[in-house]
Amino acid sequence: MGHHVTLLCGGWPDAPPRAVLDGIEVHRVGTRATFPFLARRYWHRHLADANFDVLVEDINKVPLFTPTWRSPVRVGLVPHLFGGTAFQELAAPLAAAVWLAERPLPLIYRHDAFEAISESTRDDLVRRGVAHERIRVIFPGIDTDHYTPDASVRSRTPLFAYLGRLKKYKGVDLVIRAFAAANIPGAELEIAGAGEYRSELERLSRTLEVHDRVRFLGRIDESTKIALLRRAWATLFASPKEGWGITNLEAAASGTPVIASNSPGIRESVRHGVTGYLVPHGDVAAMAERMQHLSNAHELVEQLGAAAREFATEFTWQRAAEETEAHLREVVTIGGVR
């Protein structure tokens, strides 16, 4: 598209402070923890005079409050806002800091445009006081050439999978409880991902006496991930809130149905009864019932999987790029939002 893109982000030990990746000029400052506190100073010292047309801020956990910077027209890119869910994962002081940092968004960003990755995130912004007309919803894409179906490798016996971080707020405990409640003969649950909540989840599987049918795979590589998505009869997702269910779309592109909580963000990545099923968040019995239903109807797994694959093809990175470019051009042309 002929654009010049500069990325300012956090670094990690031994990471070079500057790099050019796929034509993008990358500036790394601080670490994941310190970046929010160092970004402003770095910007004003090294980038503020670079004559950018637009500054896009990824508003994630701790806002940078770029409207207080010396900067061009701005767009706030919002995956999702934590709100009260921060208290489910973080210690009270840290959760309170995240919650408080999000509170002044409508005031401080009152002249800025926003790009939300889901309608749920847009609605969250509106509830907090951001005008609806200042928000453009642009869904992320999925590489459907990378994630592809292969029904020939589907597990012969019911196999369910969870893929994602093992964090308390992700609701993986609900997935294990539902699997235990379903009590499907010969069924297995494979959990892929890492996190400090793993030991507690392993204890839960022992308490529920399903530890011999629940496998914790840890962090897996991409090829193993693709194989798991293809083998599973359904993936399970029970988070109370997400910006977007990217794992659900990866499963869909792989021809695998999804059983997920009817939660903000997640509900937009599953078409209930078409590509999988949505159940009330926290309703273990409802999730277990859907698992039982699929286990008794293998042909339904393939039917939902085929529809899921078709659904996933609607979400391309080309479309996301074109919509984002159009939005940024519009904001630059009108000089932001007033």
Q: What residue spans do the PLM features occupy?
A:
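Carbohydrate-associated surface elements
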Residues: 120, 141
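Nucleotide-activated donor-binding/catalytic signature segment of Leloir-type glycosyltransferases, i.e.
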Residues: 202-220
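Conserved donor-binding/catalytic core segment of Leloir-type glycosyltransferases
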Residues: 115, 151-179, 190
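Short alpha-helical donor nucleotide-sugar binding micro-motif in glycosyltransferases
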Residues: 219-220, 227-232
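Conserved acidic donor-binding segment of nucleotide-sugar-dependent glycosyltransferases
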Residues: 272-273, 277-284, 293-298
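Short hydrophobic beta-strand element within catalytic cores of glycosyltransferases
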Residues: 257-260, 270
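Aromatic "clamp/platform" in nucleotide-sugar-dependent glycosyltransferases that forms part
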Residues: 240
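Membrane-proximal helix-turn-helix segments that form the acceptor-binding/catalytic region
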Residues: 94-114
